[in-house]
Each structure stands twice: as C-alpha cells, then as structure tokens.
Amino acid sequence: MLKAALVFLVALVCTVAASQEIKTDVGYGSDAAQRLDLRIPAAKNFATLIFAHGGSLTSGDKADSDYTHVCDSFPQVEIACANLNYRLGPQHPWPAQAEDLASAVAWVHTNIASYGGDPKKLFLLGHSSGATLVALAGSDDTYLAKHRLKLSDLRGVMPMGSIMWDDDLEQAIAQHGREAIAQNFLRDPDNRMYGSLEKYEDHWPIHHVHAGLPPFLFLIAESEQEQPSVLKTNVKFVQDARKFGNEADYKVFAGRKHYTMVRQLHLPRDPVFAIIVEFMRKHDL
C-alpha cells in the first residue's frame, strides 16, 4: 500500500502545478509568538494540516531548519498546511503552549473557508514536544472547548516522535514515593514552568484517553523504539484508545531517526509524507 501511495504522490506532484498561496506570520492571537505560516493549494474544499514544532516547549521556531520546509509539499497534493509558533516556557508557564495550539486550531476553523478550505477537515501533526501538544489537544477536550470546538472537529491526529507519559518519573515515584518526588520537583528549573508535579503529570496525553477521540496515527522512527521510550508509550496509548472504541494505530519507519522523520517531509518520495497524506485522504470524507 505504501509503494502504491508513493507512486501516486510522485505522479501527482510531477503533474500538478506548484501553484499555491503563501501567507506568513499570520496572527492567531495578540502575542508576538502567536503566529503561523499558511500554505494554501490551488484547490477547493481542501483539508488542512496544522503542524506544531518541537523543542521541549521551551525552544524551537517554525523557521528553524528542521521545520521550515515541513509544509512545502502538501499544497501540491491539495492539502493546506499551517506551520505555527506558540508561546514558549519558562517565560510563558504551562499551559500557554497547549492553549496556543487550540487557539491556532480555532483560527484555522474560522478562517480557512475564506481561502477555499473546508473547516470540517482539520488534522493535527506535531513533532517531539509538538507531538505531545497535538496528542493532548486531541484527547483533553478542555482546550478546544474554550473556543466552542469539540474533539469531533478534528478529523485526525498524528503525533511524531514523542513519549505519551514520563516513564522515568513514574519509576522514580514507585521507588522513592510520591511525596519525596513532589518536594523536589520544582527545584529543577525545567520543571518550574508547570507549577506543580500534578500539572506536569496532567500534561501527558496518556491520562486523557477516553471514548470519542479522533483517529490517531503515531509516527515513530526506528531509533525511537527504545531510547527514548517513544514506541512503548505510543503503543500503550493506542491500546488504551482502542479499548474505548477509538481508531488508533502506529507506524515505525525503518532507518529513520528523531529528526530525519521531519526533515524530509517536503520530499514527494518521502514515505512519512506518503503515510500522512494517505491517513488524511482516508479521513477527509
């Protein structure tokens, strides 16, 4: 199936004109960080992919070399793509990052029809910590609810290269006790943006699996099967989601590493690109 998808995409990219409209630094909020770049295909009623970059929620930018080309090829297969920035910690404490993703989704939902898109065909893709954000937005309905949106307004969610819970933390709690870990949690500067151990734990998507989730497809590099434990936590999310009757699956890409998963998305022969498009085509009806 993947080979057929690749052949189709290469043929389409080679025959469809690369005509597209590009909007840069579009504001979806009042903060300077709340900006997105939007690539729009020369088509009508198209689906839109919303991408969130990685960087541990404290760094990263849509213009970084790892992320600047993520959206390039999607308009050539009649998919719009929004590459967004969001407020970063520790200057902006959690949950500013998740709130910004939800705000970006709301902006696209409200405005994409004016560009020819279908607001009912929205998909999320995130890399690394951005994958945590999209998985959370696709499972914890409180973020979208602030914009009068529901999880059913998302056609699909694709987390790429992120754990779904902190396994090291869970092991530490089991070994040393919750009280001891909680007392030391905020002494780590990286943890202070969360405000408490409870808020940190709650930001992991595994704690929000329930019935009524949009379809999930986890995209995993071969090197991520053990360290970090991306495969382990993604499989557990898939299993839990299926128990509630949701559609969820994962795909491991041979020969890929954490960053090569995202750096080659703009190449029409890229198998990760092909799987993303295939998933979107399946669910954009």
Q: Where in this protein do the model-derived segments appear?
A:
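C-terminal catalytic histidine-bearing segment of alpha/beta-hydrolase fold enzymes
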Residues: 39, 217-219, 223, 235-238, ...
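Active-site-adjacent alpha-helix of alpha/beta-hydrolase-fold enzymes
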Residues: 175-194, 222-249
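Short beta-strand element of the alpha/beta-hydrolase
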Residues: 46-55
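Short amphipathic alpha-helix adjacent to the substrate-entry channel of hydrolases
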Residues: 63-82
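Mobile cap/lid helix-loop segments that gate and shape the active-site cleft of serine hydrolases
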Residues: 31, 168-208
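Alpha/beta-hydrolase active-site loop
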Residues: 92-112
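Primarily recognizes the serine-hydrolase "nucleophile elbow" in alpha/beta-hydrolase
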Residues: 106-173
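N-terminal cap/lid segment of alpha/beta-hydrolase-fold proteins
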Residues: 19-44
